[in-house]
Amino acid sequence: MASEPQQPSPYPYATPDQPRQLTDEDLTLLSHYTGEKDLDKLREHVLNIWKAVKAKLWVYACIQRLMFLQPRIPTHDFYPQALAALKSDPDLLVLDIGCCFGQDTRQMILDGVPTESITSTDITSDYWEFGKDLFKDRDTLAVHEAFGSFTDPAFTAAGGPLGHLSGRVAFAWAGAVLHVLSEEDVRAFAKHVYKILASGGVWFGTCVGSEPAGEWAATPNGDAKRYLHSPTSLKALLQHIGFSQVDVVGSMPAEMSSMNDDMVQSGGQKTMLAYTARK
Ligand SMILES: C[S@@+](CC[C@H](N)C(=O)[O-])C[C@H]1O[C@@H](n2cnc3c(N)ncnc32)[C@H](O)[C@@H]1O
């Protein structure tokens, strides 16, 4: 299971017993979604979940930093367009790929996307199950869910867990996923996203990038090196696969400048990439 570390964590900051202090802003989504207004109660709840996750699972940098509380999908320029379409046509389908705890799934629900339209998927159900405790919706969450690797052709092929969606998905979202994959796996992942999209469907997402592109830390199972694309190399890959109207933009949000200081130092200058690509 990918969430079980086969190697020591590459993050020098992944060892403290306590995470950083939670701000009120960190708790905005959780408070809106659960209806819990007592933020101190939520702080304690998050801390308990974080400790349980840390004891059992691979702790990605974004988990260590409690970034799973903050929805990422609203930060993408394409989201308003996808949201408007999904709200106006309940037949349109959306995937949250690499959903982890599922903060973006919950954000879409809060924003009015019909739960029937959403499929949340990840290589493992481990974080997702903790997400049901975190968001306190184990008995009410009505989105579709499917678990397996998007790099595996069988996952999206006929008869596979997502085979029934092949060629039918209007929007595929992948927040902060590509940078945990090897170069070969990014290619396979992108091919399978292309396949599952309907004609005219859009893949949009974010990932850590590097200028120049290159290998980075080891993947969680230790088998390969993760690959960080540059805007140019990711655009070329997506166009090669068949996507059109590909747009890849690099930026340097505050969280990234600190990552350049304390993440494993290899490859070029790290940036955050936001991409949009149409089938
Ligand atoms: C860095 S986390 C980002 C999670 C979340 N989307 C976010 O924005 O916070 C990367 C996620 O990708 C998932 N993942 C890794 N490899 C995957 C694969 N081959 N197929 C699907 N999901 C994968 C991980 O399990 C993890 O949940």
Say what each PLM segment does:
Residues 2-165, 184-186, 192, 201-279:
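Class I (Rossmann-like) S-adenosyl-L-methionine-dependent methyltransferase catalytic domain
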